[in-house]
Amino acid sequence: MTVRHWVALDACRKAPNAGAALVLLQRMSADTGLEGLARALRREWPDSAAVSWTLLGNVSGEMLAPWLTQPGEDIWISPDGTARRATLGPLLTPSPLPASQAGLWLVTGGARGVTAACAIELARQSGGTFILAGRSAETPWPTGIRETTDLKTLRGLMASSAVRHGEKPSPAEIDKAARTAIAGLEIRSTLAQIKATGADARYLPMDTSDAGSVTAALAHIRQRYGAISGLVHGAGVLADRLVEEKTEAELRRVFATKAEGLFHILSNIDRAALRHVGLFSSASAFFGNRGQSDYAMANAILANAGRALHAELPGTQVKVFDWGPWEGGMVDATLARHFKEKGVPLIPLGEGARIFAHELLAGDPSDVELIVGTVWSNT
């Protein structure tokens, strides 16, 4: 999957972007996401026409020909030659929560940040047991140093402590130790907040980009806790760079965590036991965003994987959340200013978490893909 999408991106980079007309052709499957690339290209190359055509079966060349003269937009083409635009469901007021939703939940990327807030709210509304999985180690807080989540402050405290003890760590070593300590502190805080709701919570180191790590972690969960009934895939990384500058290594890193990671999990669990699946996608996959061609493709794959799961598991609530930018998420100060200038407000942490939990537990089952946040126009 990753190689296939890199080949497409690399081919686009070699096309003249001034006035170019690019049609990205793909067959509908759970592991394809070229529509994300087309949408990112339209943001980065406004003078070009980049579209994706997704074939919903065996479509002949004769059936495709008439669409070459149509206005450029992303479409799904059926074997009879008819086409429709890619659409998603509206965010509606969900129905009341069922009486009990307790089960065994696996949450990737769920011990820190935005996904942690969603996991806490989900625990509050559902109960059950939560296994939070992430790459960070649950490192104990260093002895003799006061707790703080401010990285700059902690680096200073650690440097002063090292001097008192006659140690001479490098700035890079201090930074790494500080980040590791804060990660451990945040993990323990999330576990405590989930337990405060009455649910149970455990942390398990697991790197979704590493198939071996996922296999071992899920075997442990299966042996100790049983079958997973709820999956929340929130793990993800960014490597923002314009298409012309994008490297294969960056794309691989983004795909490994977000897209490949999901399939590593799905191939190691009993999918028939799933009752809820919540996938953290991004509005950049639906609207495109400058510098995020790889991230848009990886998240578009999540949307298609969600549709495939919805078809495979008709009794399972499957939701793909195309999130806009969050307060306290991966949006730094510079990017926050960019969105503000474009009229795209950040999603408040508490409000976003409540939307997530209520939609996943009680939203309309027919609405698989949802945009949460303001519609992007010219971002």
Residue ranges, per PLM feature:
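NAD(P)H/NAD(P)+-dependent Rossmann-fold oxidoreductase cores
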Residues: 1-13, 17, 57, 61-281, ...
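Hydrophobic anchor at the start of a short beta-strand
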Residues: 20-22, 48-50, 130, 201, ...
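C-terminal low-complexity, glycine/proline- and small-hydrophobic-enriched intrinsically disordered tails
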Residues: 21-22, 134, 358
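The conserved SAM/SAH-binding core of class I Rossmann-like methyltransferase domains
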Residues: 25, 53, 133, 204, ...
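Flexible, glycine-rich beta-alpha linker
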Residues: 30-36, 40-64, 137-143, 239-240, ...
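Glycine/proline-rich active-site loop of Rossmann-fold NAD(P)-dependent oxidoreductases
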Residues: 68-72, 361-367
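Structured, non-catalytic alpha/beta "coupling" segments that mediate domain-domain communication
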Residues: 76, 364-379
